[in-house]
């Protein structure tokens, strides 16, 4: 092992310069022989230890695969723990239900940008996934009869939208993600997975288009670790911290999507950013949609339950994009609350105190701490807040990462999987339904393990790394560590976040987006002016935050470019200058007699953004939406309609 380490250091020290992405600093290899490099070999390496990563790890460990989990924080601190409201599955505990109704709601919620084969896989496997969680020991809330308790969530209906609001969301009070994370972590330890905790993934290791592992920095002692593997799973979460006001934790910096970008993989549908209707005003902390599922409602300055005007049937339980836009319109038209009339009230105090204590204990505490509100007596001040990324690393329904070409269609990237929020299986399309996120995590984390078990055997040979693997990553690390510009990381990050908040918000307009694109491109060049004040390698948060900013910048620039280019309104992407959804047909009218628009003339297609790793230039392409289900005899595709709730 030591001989291999010394050999790598010698090879790295022999090189002089490297050409790197514009999102990185100008680097030189002259100083990097000082870094200790340690090699590891595993059947599978998983980057990230949230719900998706842990579910994949557990399945692989049970099957006897030597599995490593590389995570930049302790697993139970992963952002899955912040998920409050629940996980969707058509169990039928509270009322008759059918997974096909769940499938319909998911397709409708996506505003018909989701791939229906993947949505078929998600909803058909939902009941089994939740039952497995129960068997693993997840302590779901119960009905008096002992069944898993289910609440209403936005966009969920019975009988294909004809039977009223469904109760489909299984929960553990309002701490569902916390409970899931602890359950999965405990079970993955039982399966003998090896955890590399507080390791920061620097880059995927690629060999002629195949992923053969990952290179990471140990935050505790500054050593570099190269993990070679037969399969690599990216499960790093979203990039909410590209925005100023968001519900996501500070570690949600788009590391996985940035890893994919630097590996030459185009990202899918990044323009679709979900704004949750109820983030605490001025703070951003999440107030679960479950609070409205339990009977809470939104009011404006006139005390009006205004959602009745925007969604006469679903009211406060319309899909999140609809509710967030309604709130924003109320504020823009002068009906906001507070001294500045710039937010909305969420009212819960009409509900029995016992119900709040039993079903919503966490948000009662959160509202008290962060808003100074007693929910049994006062409304909670809320505002739409960045919450979720619908886009990410494109995959098929098996969670295999794909590249799309017009000539060959979808092609699998050998050796690479993705799951969780960093992935775009395209089950959410243009707008995710509440409580489909935890479901996405466990279903596609599970899919990773199922498909890897079909592809591999534990005793197969692990491929060798190519010559000089990871050199560029170490050189960039060294350049960031010794960066001596005049712009502090925190200052540049704040400017980026405010730019994204202002120019790519709930409502968008061409001139504002174009201005935002220019600003973001200029800001990305400012990365070369970063100043790192701490030169150490041991628990150096200044260094880590600079690396995270590089990742955030890649995500933010691709997001705003994709948003500026999509000239329609669909789901979470709402354009004032292009207020209509542009499909291949006008679905507000009978399609008989209509001529189908060619692919380049409509917008019911996935955006693909590919950022050049050397120039920073972003190339746009488009991928067709998959309308065909996995088995039309089991459930046929849901044709587009004009959404209403």
Curated annotation (Swiss-Prot):
**Chain sites annotated for binding fumarate:** 85, 276, 288-289, 387, 432, 435
| Biological-process GO terms, alphabetical | mitochondrial electron transport, succinate to ubiquinone; tricarboxylic acid cycle
Provide the cofactor list for this protein: FAD
Q: Which domain of life is it from?
A: Eukaryota
Give all Tele-8alpha-FAD histidine modified positions. Answer: 79
What's this protein's name? Succinate dehydrogenase [rhodoquinone] flavoprotein subunit 1, mitochondrial
One Pfam family of this chain: Succ_DH_flav_C
What species is given as this protein's source?
A: Ascaris suum (Pig roundworm)
According to Swiss-Prot or TrEMBL, what is its membrane topology? Peripheral membrane protein
Q: What keywords would UniProt list here? A: Electron transport, FAD, Flavoprotein, Membrane, Mitochondrion, Mitochondrion inner membrane, Nucleotide-binding, Oxidoreductase, Transit peptide, Transport
Q: In which tissues is it expressed?
A: Expressed in adult muscles (at protein level).
Q: Which InterPro entries match?
A: FAD-dep_OxRdtase_2_FAD-bd (IPR003953), FAD/NAD-bd_sf (IPR036188), FRD_SDH_FAD_BS (IPR003952), Fum_R/Succ_DH_flav-like_C_sf (IPR037099), Fum_Rdtase/Succ_DH_flav-like_C (IPR015939), SdhA/FrdA/AprA (IPR030664), Succ_DH/fumarate_Rdtase_cat_sf (IPR027477), Succ_DH_flav_su_fwd (IPR011281)
User: How, per the record, is the cofactor bound?
Assistant: Binds 1 FAD covalently per subunit.
Q: Which NCBIfam families match?
A: sdhA_forward, sdhA_frdA_Gneg
Protein residues bound to FAD: 49, 52, 71-72, 78, 80, 84-86, 201, 255, 421, 432, 437-438
